Amino acid sequence: MAFSLEEAAGRIKDCWDNQEVPALSTCSNANIFRRINAILDDSLDFSKVCTTPINRGIHDQLPDFQDSEETVTSRMLFPTSAQESPRGLPDANGLCLGLQSLSLTGWDRPWSTQDSDSSAQSSTQSVLSMLQNPLGNVLGKAPLSFLSLDPLGSDLDKFPAPSVRGSRLDTRPILDSRSSSPSDSDTSGFSSGSDHLSDLISSLRISPPLPFLSMTGNGPRDPLKMGVGSRMDQEQAALAAVAPSPTSAPKRWPGASVWPSWDLLGAPKDPFSIEREARLHRQAAAVNEATCTWSGQLPPRNYKNPIYSCKVFLGGVPWDITEAGLVNTFRVFGSLSVEWPGKDGKHPRCPPKGNMPKGYVYLVFELEKSVRALLQACSHDPLSPDGLSEYYFKMSSRRMRCKEVQVIPWVLADSNFVWSPSQRLDPSRTVFVGALHGMLNAEALAAILNDLFGGVVYAGIDTDKHKYPIGSGRVTFNNQRSYLKAVTAAFVEIKTTKFTKKVQIDPYLEDSLCLICSSQPGPFFCRDQVCFKYFCRSCWHWRHSMEGLRHHSPLMRNQKN
């Protein structure tokens, strides 16, 4: 049913040149409207369709576009007799292809209440939803929204000009809707499965000719840009023509602006998306590149009568090991329990699914002397390059004999390191360091960050209830410059002879009020230096809905239950 480009250009020329032929009958849309009316069982009233010839003066003012490329790529405007098309954009009635003359109830009062004539309005909604005209959506179920992603299915590709396909926007409805779902409009009026009806709709010319639009600007406009943007210009002009004043928008228009949701398009749909983003940021070291690298040997460790945590790490355990096997092997050193690795410490006493260990496990003894006894039974090399004593214990399982596993204890003195005891520790100059390696103690962490940024006065390793490290720490600087350098670095790669690990640096967070409203708690922190403050939920959404700030990632304190 689609027309060729040459035929479309010829029909446009006929519409302007022939004064004796009625507008509706000469345009290619006339037969289409009649066939649509036939499908509707002649429910549309064509008695008031205007047949007055078009004013000749308009044609004289238009440029000759018989051989113009703009003519070939344009679609016809349907003028009515009640108006002489102005030299600018067409008004709302002109854009509606003469539908006002089809006696469509409620056309002249799109903001009427819901208790208007429902039967006539249903007929109007059906036709207008087929045309996908922005004014049709005023009466439909998604007022003043742009075209949906696939309003006519695959038949959308049959439109002759690229401007229709180029103007498809994935936006939410601008204003409130009578329907709980925009998809409800797809089932009203006609069945979307009618191929014949789709062919009719795909053949409609619903945009004004490009030469007609070209006269609206102060200077010449690029035909290519006009081909893409003509649909947007048309919709904006139509909305401006029908939009009521701010004082006359009582029910369907909650705000004075015609486009109230443009400012809300960037807002997250889920109000709890901030928490999800904050949780994802905690694992950012796994997916981000390091901005700087430290390589070298860790400072030697010299202990005199060290005190150990009652919890030890076992690495490289046999894959078929069971909890009973672990208890039977290590209970000779004292009473103990087994903690299997679990997500965020959940169900730590339960083995993984399928009873398949991840290759490591934690042993928790009741007494610290049990750990000493275990280490004495291990083989170790005290002369390692980094000054670290590595402990290995031989154990067996049902299918593996004499497997050597690594035992990593934790000395309580390694949890804190103070470089300057007289220096006051300022939380506002403290950074949080995540994704630490298990062999990294506070002294080594302080030395690494002092080499990179300078000014370190304190370093601490975060521990659990058994005083065993949990993989994070804190470092305090004595000046703001070093602190900001560390925060800006964000990701640092640490290379030693024993391991290579990428750590993550963030500002250390405290309990604080929102620094915008100063009335609500501020659990969310923006680490970008444009913001760099605490926010409550409402102030976060308000601040970060602005252009250029939407990419900021939130931080939250990792509060354990």
UniProtKB/Swiss-Prot annotation:
- Region annotation (Necessary for stress granule assembly and correct localization in dcp1 bodies) maps to 329-561
Kindly list the positions annotated as binding Zn(2+) 1. Answer: 514, 517, 536, 539
**Expressing tissues:** Expressed in hippocampus, cerebral cortex and oocytes (at protein level). Expressed in brain, heart, kidney, lung and ovary and testis. Weakly expressed in granular cells of dentate gyrus and the pyramidal cells of CA3 and CA1 of the hippocampus.
Keyword entries, A-Z: Activator, Cytoplasm, Membrane, Metal-binding, mRNA processing, Phosphoprotein, Repeat, Repressor, Ribonucleoprotein, RNA-binding, Synapse, Translation regulation, Zinc
- Residues annotated as region Disordered? 159-194
Q: How is it modified after translation?
A: Phosphorylated on serine/threonine residues by AURKA within positions 165 and 196. Phosphorylation and dephosphorylation on Thr-171 regulates cytoplasmic polyadenylation and translation of CPE-containing mRNAs. Phosphorylation on Thr-171 by AURKA in embryonic ovaries at 16.5 dpc (mostly pachytene oocytes) activates CPEB1. Not phosphorylated on Thr-171 in embryonic ovaries between 18.5 dpc (diplotene oocytes) and metaphase I. Dephosphorylation on Thr-171 by PP1 in embryonic ovaries at 18.5 dpc (mostly diplotene oocytes) inactivates CPEB1.
From the Swiss-Prot or TrEMBL record, state where the protein is found. Cytoplasm; Synapse; Cytoplasm, P-body; Cytoplasmic granule
Q: Which SMART domains match?
A: RRM
**Residues annotated as site: Important for the positionning of RRM1 relative to RRM2:** 410
Functional note: Sequence-specific RNA-binding protein that regulates mRNA cytoplasmic polyadenylation and translation initiation during oocyte maturation, early development and at postsynapse sites of neurons. Binds to the cytoplasmic polyadenylation element (CPE), an uridine-rich sequence element (consensus sequence 5'-UUUUUAU-3') within the 3'-UTR of mRNAs. In absence of phosphorylation and in association with TACC3 is also involved as a repressor of translation of CPE-containing mRNA; a repression that is relieved by phosphorylation or degradation.
Family per UniProt?
Belongs to the RRM CPEB family.
What is the name listed in the Swiss-Prot or TrEMBL entry for this protein? Cytoplasmic polyadenylation element-binding protein 1
- What is the protein's species of origin? Mus musculus (Mouse)
- Source taxonomy: Eukaryota, Metazoa, Chordata, Craniata, Vertebrata
- Give me the gene this protein comes from: Cpeb1
